[in-house]
Regions:
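Aromatic/hydrophobic pocket-lining residues that form the small-molecule binding cavity
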Residues: 31, 66, 110, 114, ...
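Hydrophobic faces of well-ordered beta-strands that scaffold small-molecule active sites
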Residues: 14-18, 46-48, 80-84, 126-131, ...
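N-terminal binding-site loop/beta-alpha segment at the start of enzyme catalytic domains
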Residues: 1-81, 152, 237-241
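Active-site mouth loops of central-metabolism enzymes
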Residues: 19-29, 96-108, 132, 137
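Beta/alpha (TIM)-barrel catalytic core signal, keyed to glycine-rich beta->alpha loops juxtaposed to Asp/Glu
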Residues: 138-326
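Active-site groove signature of glycoside hydrolases
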Residues: 118-139
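Structural motif corresponding to the early beta-alpha repeats
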Residues: 73-103
Length: 326
């Protein structure tokens, strides 16, 4: 497993991370097996969020399962990195209508939720805490108070953002100032073969061929993150972005799966491994967040972290996924 430095921090972590959004559906033994599988493949970075508990309909549920699982798997706290996300309020009171009620970057909300996460995870600090989605009502003094309080108390070592555009990140960083402890080190964004808009937007710059619609929805996120030395963390990299779910082995995406199978045969690995390798091939040094709770499938995905795709193979897969080369 290759390691990468997260942002400008001194943290050298595995380039693949385990995301535990669905871990609340597992019992203790199954969760420990998933964590153990990840660790055996070199993973030392684990990503969660305060709202992950959609199966059991309860806040902090996945974090609580992870908090036991990393210990049951025989891992030591000093050997792993734990990351959580906060800033969304979910109403779980009606199991048939679970929904977000607001985004909340108030100091009180962020500090309270982080404390609850620490208790759930069974630790007294997290290595990274990310603002989960942008709060349009966020206020500078509230963000600064929350981050400063949490860092000085030793509860959060580094910070980051998730699902924000470049200008939102710039605004936040302008409030937080130049203190290295307040740097936004990571930016978690959806990215994968069938969610490659960050790339297609940049390829389409100054392009407008007949029949080609050009619209930039990512605001230059890819280049911005590289310029600011923010590590992109790719979430849901195997999702198709459609009603059909994951794309690997899915009959609704025959061209992509044909290409994946061809490359898998060439490199002697699974299609899942190739899909992982595609994300990690980009020189932006993206960290992939894999969320499979199936140990066999997770192992196949993680095998891709050791593959260096040929450039042409990378482009072949990009096109097979329905993306255009202008």
């Amino acid at each position: 497993m290759k390691s990468i430095v997260i942002g400008k921090s001194a943290v050298g972590a595995s380039q693949a991370a385990l995301g535990v959004m669905r871990m609340d559906a597992l019992d203790a033994d199954a969760a420990a097996e998933v964590v153990r599988t990840a660790a055996e493949h070199g993973v030392n970075f684990f990503d969660t969020a305060d709202i992950y508990g959609f199966n059991v309909k309860h806040d902090h549920a996945s974090s609580r399962v992870l908090g036991r699982a990393w210990k049951d798997a025989g891992l030591k706290r000093e050997d792993i990195f734990l990351q959580t996300k906060f800033g969304i309020n979910i109403d779980f009171s009606d199991p048939n209508n679970v929904h977000a009620t607001r985004y909340d970057f108030s100091a009180k909300h962020l500090i309270t939720r982080l404390d609850e996460e620490l208790e759930a995870l069974g630790t007294d600090y997290v290595d990274f805490a990310l603002l989960h989605r942008p709060d349009t009502l966020m206020e500078a003094e509230e963000i600064v108070e929350a981050f400063t309080t949490l860092h000085k108390a030793g509860k959060v070592r580094h910070f980051g953002v998730s699902n924000v555009n470049p200008w939102q990140a710039e605004l936040l960083q302008s409030w937080l100032g130049d203190d290295p402890a307040m740097r936004l080190e990571a930016s978690q964004l959806q990215f994968g073969l069938m969610h490659a808009q960050m790339i297609s937007d940049e390829l389409m710059t100054n392009s407008g061929a007949e029949g080609m619609v050009v619209a930039n929805h990512s605001d230059g996120l890819l280049s911005y993150s590289r310029l600011r030395h923010m590590t992109i963390q790719a979430w849901s990299p195997f999702q198709s972005g459609t009603e059909y779910g994951p794309f690997v082995g899915n009959e609704h995406f025959p061209e992509l799966n044909k290409a994946l199978d061809e490359k898998a045969a060439k490199y002697g690995v699974s299609a899942n491994a190739i899909a992982t390798a595609w994300v990690l091939r980009h020189p932006a040094k993206i960290q992939i967040v894999l969320g499979s709770m199936n140990p066999t499938r997770l192992g196949e995905m993680l095998d891709g972290a050791d593959i260096d795709l040929d450039k042409q193979d990378w482009w072949d897969l990009y096109v097979a996924a329905g993306n255009l080369i202008p």
